[in-house]
A protein has these predicted regions:
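Conserved catalytic core of the tyrosine transesterase superfamily
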Residues: 1-277
């Protein structure tokens, strides 16, 4: 394997794939970048491999596990920080296995490294189970409940900013495969984000029950209040807090006391960044 393969893949991952295909924020990309700075420094200091000599064959499951232990034992990082670094590595090696099939076997081994469980205490982040519990709260026998499920599930699915959700129109949704949504972000920049089949089911149900698949529906926002006006940031926050409180009553250990719309976005960036193709 040529030495250039690793640096080129890392550069493509950080400068093209994450901002382009995944639409990751600059803060998230910066966090990933720091992960690789730490990894490269570790490989030089503890393995004697100069950065310019580092190749994929040096990055084995064993070396990654040693790096994670180094973060905790030497740098005194928390389990949470360790998991953030591992999530970044998972995202990279998931990307690599499609770009460099020759590395598929070792990539799979690295991807098998599990996130570490922290000691039990007050939860301050959302988990898979927490998200599932939250999304099970809306009453689907009511129009408002159907709307709220579609709203929360969409925020979870695509990791959109609150303002991007507020500005959505029915035409923003591509309801035929491949399912996508067009988000208008800061600076009026548009990005196309794929949607999971499960989310499209919720959206289609909501849109059909509210006439949002009809031509005239473009007069209205996708998510609106009783006056057919756009939901506000405060309104969406109220919806999230309402169902978080309900979910917390079901299981206090799964829903953090402090939860925000940004929490859902962070969840998507943290856990979903690894899905590549």
């Amino acid at each position: 394997m040529k030495t250039v393969d690793f640096p080129k893949s890392l550069a493509d991952f950080l400068t093209k794939y994450l901002p382009g295909e995944r639409g990751m924020s600059s803060n998230t990309i910066s966090s990933y970048r720091i992960t690789f700075i730490l990894l490269i420094s570790f490989m030089e200091e503890y393995k004697g491999i100069k950065p310019q000599k580092l190749v994929f064959n040096d990055l084995t499951k064993k070396s990654i596990e040693e790096f994670l232990n180094y973060l905790e034992q030497v740098r005194k990082c928390s389990v949470s920080t360790r998991n953030v670094r591992l999530a970044a590595l998972h995202a990279f090696f998931n990307f690599v296995q499609y770009e460099w099939p020759e590395q598929l076997d070792e990539c799979r081994r690295i991807l098998s490294i599990k996130l570490k469980k922290a000691k039990q205490g007050t939860i301050n982040y959302l988990t898979v189970e927490g998200i599932q519990l939250l999304l099970s709260q809306p009453d689907l026998s009511t129009k408002k409940g159907i709307r709220d499920l579609a709203l929360l599930a969409l925020m979870y699915d695509c990791g959109a900013r609150v303002q991007e959700i507020i500005d959505l129109m029915p035409g923003s949704i591509r309801s035929n495969k491949p399912y996508t949504i067009k988000l208008i972000g800061k600076g009026n920049k548009a990005r196309i984000v794929p949607l999971m089949d499960e989310e499209v089911v919720h959206l289609k149900n909501y849109m059909s029950k509210n006439g949002l698949s009809e031509p005239y529906a473009e007069m209205y926002p996708l998510f609106y209040n009783t006056r057919r006006e756009k939901l506000t940031r405060a309104g969406i926050t109220h919806i999230l807090h309402k169902y978080a409180a309900m979910a917390r009553k079901c299981n206090t250990g799964l829903i953090p006391e402090k939860i925000s719309c940004h929490s859902l976005r962070q969840y998507v960036e943290y856990y979903n960044m690894g899905s590549v193709h």
